[in-house]
Design a protein with these regions (language model features):
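Short beta-strand/turn micro-motifs at beta-sheet edges
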Residues: 24-27, 82-84
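Beta-hairpin "wing" of winged helix-turn-helix
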Residues: 77-91, 96
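Residues that scaffold the ATP/ADP-binding catalytic core of kinase and kinase-like folds
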Residues: 41, 83, 104-105
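Intrinsically disordered, low-complexity polyampholyte segments enriched for Lys and acidic residues
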Residues: 1-9
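Alpha-helical DNA-recognition elements
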Residues: 69, 73
Length: 127
C-alpha cells in the first residue's frame, strides 16, 4: 500500500514503532533531523565542512561522507549558498544559510518539537 505524501506526523511516528516498543527512525525522519542540525550550525555564521562537524560534536555524530551530500542537497534546494576561498594553500568551500534555509530551519524545529511531544506521550519522557 502506498502512503499519502501528507501523512499526519503522529501517525508517521506511531507507524514507525516496532513490536519491541523501540522507535524505528525512518530514513526520511533522519534526513530531516540532520538537515535541521546542519542548517542550525550554518545559521550561526558562514561555515565549512570540518567546522560544521566540530560544531555538531556532542550533539549528533555526523561523518564527512554523510555531511557533504546533505550540504549538496541543501545547496541544490536553495537553502544554502557557497563560495570557495583559499585557506592555508588549499581551497575551502564555505556555506551560508539563505532566507529559505532559515525558513526550513524554523519549520524543522517546529516539526521536532511536535515529534518530541508525541514521544513524551508514548514513552512518558523516558527511553
Amino acid at each position: 500500500k502506498k502512503r499519502k505524501k501528507s501523512v499526519d506526523k503522529s501517525y508517521y511516528v506511531m507507524y514507525s514503532i516496532r513490536q519491541s516498543g523501540v522507535l524505528s527512525v525512518d530514513i526520511q525522519l533522519k534526513k530531516g533531523i540532520l538537515d535541521v542540525c546542519v542548517l542550525h550550525a550554518i545559521s550561526k555564521g558562514e561555515s565549512y565542512g570540518y567546522k560544521i562537524i566540530s560544531d555538531l560534536e556532542g550533539v549528533i555524530e555526523i561523518s564527512e561522507s554523510t555531511l557533504y551530500p546533505i550540504l549538496k542537497r541543501l545547496e541544490t534546494g536553495g537553502f544554502v549558498t557557497t563560495r570557495t576561498a583559499e585557506f592555508s594553500g588549499r581551497l575551502r568551500r564555505y556555506y551560508k544559510i539563505t532566507k529559505s534555509g532559515l525558513e526550513k530551519l524554523f519549520a524543522g524545529r517546529s516539526d521536532l518539537q511536535e515529534i518530541n511531544v508525541i514521544y513524551k506521550k508514548i514513552f512518558g519522557g523516558r527511553l
